[in-house]
């Protein structure tokens, strides 16, 4: 993971940056700003961003991801994940996805579901590496281009300190660097 990046909890003030990345990442089927805003404000959601950290410039969001789970429910859904094109191939998708799964464990989630485009083998491969299995296909799910969605599922071991009513993680997750990855095991 390159130096100069930080992983942190997303805030509603990140909406414009997230929406810019949403539209360039998913031009045919991007979420609306009101949908994304609803996710950022939802008490059931957990969204994180990867941003640049440079003392000479304002931070810039280069990746984001979101999870949704109702309090006390052992099931969660990965809502979205995106990394800026110029940052792909550096492991940021894995960092974002790992944080979502860690939060799911902290919430006592036992099963995680997601949908991924059938024409996105890179994402499918990453999810498979995390133990997700293709369990169903939703024909023509992604509109307007009519691409099928793979529904994928994984079971999670629950973290020792997780309780279904555990509070969300602190707003600052921390820097991304080899040290942070080493700490995650």
Spans of model-derived segments:
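Short glycine/proline-centered loop/turn elements that form peptide/ligand docking sites
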Residues: 97, 120-123, 140-145
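Short glycine-rich hinge loops at helix-strand junctions in the catalytic core
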Residues: 91, 108, 131
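Well-formed, non-transmembrane alpha-helical positions, independent of function
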Residues: 17, 125-126
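Conserved catalytic-core motifs of GNAT/GCN5-like acyltransferases
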Residues: 113-115, 128, 133-150
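Acyl-donor (CoA/ACP) binding surface of acyl/acetyltransferases
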Residues: 90, 138-141, 155-157
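Acetyl-CoA-dependent GNAT
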Residues: 2-5, 9-15, 19-86, 94-107, ...
